[in-house]
């Protein structure tokens, strides 16, 4: 009778040493995200974080999101260094809509076989996103699950917790007819609409490496999502804001109504900005209707802010000084029950 072969976890497809190598690779990047409220070091069973002492009546705000099928393009073209920024942006931009300051972030990275270099690039991107949004990367999970993912595929999920003063929560209840709407420019498609983007690439037969205005098409598409947190926190310190809408999946039609009272509508001046070239390319090469563009993509607008009309000039000055591309995009008007909550003129 032959001696049974001794099996190891690695024989089953899980490489503990690779996981340890990943942790070593990311330690310096993670330390860059540190906040004074964080207690303990990376690697504990639970991550600890105190509430900042400046808050009198702190309310925690949480959010979770992913990067969607933008990951498919990143994996196919081996561009792993920016999808981590996307992950943090999708979560932290949602938190700032309530007026919340992001405190900490956790990530979940799942794959069939751990590619240490790719995972390192992803987590370093997550750390960069945390630096940009001012939150600490305090923990995460790397799951190597053979048989669950094909080849080099991986998936990401992010979890962010922030804090806001109870009396300063922004929930849209103060929005009134006559308020003005300010737009903050997007860096590209951000992290939404990529199933349609990939379909456009398929039916058009376009080469993702071809140039569009001096830049590879794939680089336009994988440009990381803009993080608006620090600029908007400064705006909130100095200006009265009634509502904010993060323009993500569902575009203008789905996201702006989420922060409006039922008796109000947003009237958007469609000629107040020019779409970035990538959106014109998608519309033309995919034969996509304008309505569908606005329902799927941000079309160059990553965030919309509602505020009193007499605060517009100061707000635009501040936001543009902070490096944002901000402009007046429309206003709030009274709405009848039969009307849509978003009009684009």
Swiss-Prot record:
Disulfide bonds: none annotated. The keyword Protein transport does not apply. GO terms for molecular function: ATP binding; phosphoribosylamine-glycine ligase activity; phosphoribosylformylglycinamidine cyclo-ligase activity. GO terms for cellular component: cytosol. One of its GO terms (biological process) is adenine biosynthetic process. It is found in: Cytoplasm. Belongs to the AIR synthase family. This is Phosphoribosylformylglycinamidine cyclo-ligase. The gene is purM.
């Amino acid at each position: 009778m032959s001696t049974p072969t001794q099996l190891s976890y690695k024989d089953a497809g899980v490489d503990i040493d690779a996981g340890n190598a990943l942790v070593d690779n990311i330690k310096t990047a993670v330390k860059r995200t540190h906040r004074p409220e964080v207690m303990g070091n990376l690697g504990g069973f639970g991550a600890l974080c105190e509430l900042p002492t400046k808050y009198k009546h702190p309310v925690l705000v949480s959010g979770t999101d992913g990067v969607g099928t933008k990951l498919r393009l990143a994996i196919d073209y081996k561009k792993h260094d920016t999808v981590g920024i996307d992950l943090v942006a999708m979560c932290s931009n949602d938190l700032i809509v309530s007026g919340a300051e992001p405190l900490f972030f956790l990530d979940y990275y799942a794959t069939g076989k751990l590619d240490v270099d790719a995972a390192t690039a992803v987590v370093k991107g997550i750390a960069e996103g945390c630096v940009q949004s001012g939150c600490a990367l305090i923990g995460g999970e790397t799951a190597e699950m053979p048989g669950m993912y094909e080849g080099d595929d991986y998936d990401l999920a992010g979890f962010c917790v922030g804090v806001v003063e109870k009396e300063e929560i922004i929930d849209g209840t103060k929005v009134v007819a006559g308020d003005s709407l300010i737009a903050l420019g997007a860096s590209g498609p951000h992290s939404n609409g990529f199933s349609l983007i990939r379909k456009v690439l398929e039916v058009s037969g376009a080469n993702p490496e071809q140039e569009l205005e001096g830049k590879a098409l794939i680089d336009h598409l994988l440009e990381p999502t803009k993080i608006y947190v620090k600029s908007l926190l400064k705006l909130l310190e100095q200006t009265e804001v009634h509502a904010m809408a993060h323009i993500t999946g569902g575009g203008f039609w789905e996201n702006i109504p989420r922060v409006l009272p039922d008796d109000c509508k947003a009237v958007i001046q469609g000629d107040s900005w020019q779409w970035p070239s990538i959106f014109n390319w998608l519309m033309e090469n995919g034969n996509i209707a304008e309505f569908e563009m606005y329902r799927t993509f941000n079309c160059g607008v990553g965030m919309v802010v509602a505020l009193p009309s007499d605060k517009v000039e100061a707000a635009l000055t501040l936001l543009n000084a902070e490096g944002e591309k901000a402009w007046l995009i429309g206003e709030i008007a009274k709405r009848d029950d039969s009307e849509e909550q978003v009009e684009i003129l």
